[in-house]
């Protein structure tokens, strides 16, 4: 059974393997053992209540409960920008007009922004290519909503997610090449590494301080503003179906979109509910896939089951109960994995 659980120190080797498969551009999952070890330690200190809100971050892994193999990672930052500034570009408009000359130009413009300061962030989502089947990607992404629903007081009103922008297999980013490189005087991979290892002071020191007309960028760079990496496109669709929207904020490095949603409007959070669990053989039937998660903060588990999403009593096998770290009589959180398609 594939389950989501909190990260552990022993996961470092598996996370190094995952980091080596990202293809670059995933700033929060670099193949750097010291950085990953520090990330794990920060997550464990978050669970133990040792960190202030601005440093808190949860990390989860997707594990095969029978073999112990790890095939994916996902994370939540509790409140971004409280320690280090959180930068985006806001894609806005400046109008230049002259009645005398009968000229009116509305120009797309990039404005440096800290508007998402204090928001909770979904981040570090990566699934091993060999595991991209059987709903694993949905489980990995949406399990975080089950954790947020169970422990709502730990998170803020707005949730954001930075989507990886367009970068080729050689690490070439059209947006960075046309804009960032002119100010930072380094390749995208170098800037990405510095940011991923926590060396972020250079951003504030070297960022352009004034609005930038997108017409001054190359056509190639303009074309990728707000667009996602091909491997990230499915993740974007998943979040949009949960209620997330692109509100014209983009990443300062690769131009990828930032999606956002009020936490209480996220479908899986809003529609999830607690049901009693019982041991037995689940009833046969054409039931949809559902997310199920325990309510145990320190030993959180989430998995997929086939069930009636409206049931008040969820029947699970002994193996499923064991994998979810719960017993008959406990209450678990249940929600349909995907929103029902509207029919006319």
Curated annotation (Swiss-Prot):
GO terms for biological process: arginine catabolic process to glutamate; arginine catabolic process to succinate. Its EC number is 2.3.1.109. Pathway: Amino-acid degradation; L-arginine degradation via AST pathway; L-glutamate and succinate from L-arginine: step 1/5. Keywords: Acyltransferase, Arginine metabolism, Transferase. It comes from the Bacteria. It catalyses: succinyl-CoA + L-arginine = N(2)-succinyl-L-arginine + CoA + H(+). The active site is at 229 (proton donor). The keyword Transferase applies. Coiled coil: none annotated. It holds the Pfam family AstA. Belongs to the arginine N-succinyltransferase family. HAMAP family: AstA. Catalyzes the transfer of succinyl-CoA to arginine to produce N(2)-succinylarginine. NCBIfam families: arg_catab_AOST, arg_catab_AstA, PRK10456.1. This is Arginine N-succinyltransferase. It comes from Salmonella typhi. The gene is astA.
């Amino acid at each position: 059974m594939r389950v989501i659980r909190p990260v552990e120190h022993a996961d470092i080797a598996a996370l190094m393997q995952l980091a080596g498969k990202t293809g670059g551009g995933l700033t929060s999952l670099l193949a750097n053992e010291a950085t990953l070890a520090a990330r794990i330690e920060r997550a464990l200190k978050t669970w133990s209540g040792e960190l202030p809100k601005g440093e808190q971050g949860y990390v989860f892994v997707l594990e095969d409960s029978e073999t112990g193999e790890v095939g994916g990672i996902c994370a939540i930052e509790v409140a971004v920008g409280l320690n280090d500034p959180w930068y985006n570009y806001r894609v806005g408009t400046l109008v230049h007009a002259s009645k005398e000359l009968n000229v009116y130009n509305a120009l797309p413009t990039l404005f440096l922004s800290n508007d998402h300061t204090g928001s909770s962030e979904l981040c570090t989502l990566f699934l091993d290519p060999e595991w991209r089947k059987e709903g694993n990607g949905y489980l990995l992404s949406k399990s975080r909503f089950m954790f947020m629903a169970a422990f709502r007081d730990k998170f803020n009103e707005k949730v954001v997610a930075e989507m990886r922008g367009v970068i080729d297999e050689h690490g070439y980013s059209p947006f960075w090449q046309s804009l960032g490189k002119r100010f930072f005087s380094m390749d995208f991979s170098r800037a990405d590494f510095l940011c991923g290892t926590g060396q972020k002071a250079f951003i504030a020191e070297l960022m352009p301080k004034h609005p930038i007309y997108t017409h001054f960028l190359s056509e190639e760079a303009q074309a990728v503003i707000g667009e996602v990496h091909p491997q990230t496109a499915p993740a974007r669709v998943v979040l949009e179906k949960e209620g997330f929207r692109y509100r014209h904020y983009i990443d300062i490095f690769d131009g990828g979109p930032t999606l956002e949603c009020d936490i209480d409007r996220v479908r899986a959070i809003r529609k999830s509910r607690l049901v009693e669990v019982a041991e037995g053989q689940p009833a046969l039937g054409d039931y949809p896939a559902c997310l199920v998660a325990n309510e145990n903060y320190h030993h959180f588990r989430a998995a997929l089951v086939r069930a009636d999403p409206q049931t008040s009593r969820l029947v699970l096998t002994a193996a499923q109960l064991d994998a979810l770290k719960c017993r008959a009589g406990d209450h678990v959180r249940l929600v349909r994995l995907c929103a029902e398609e509207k029919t006319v």
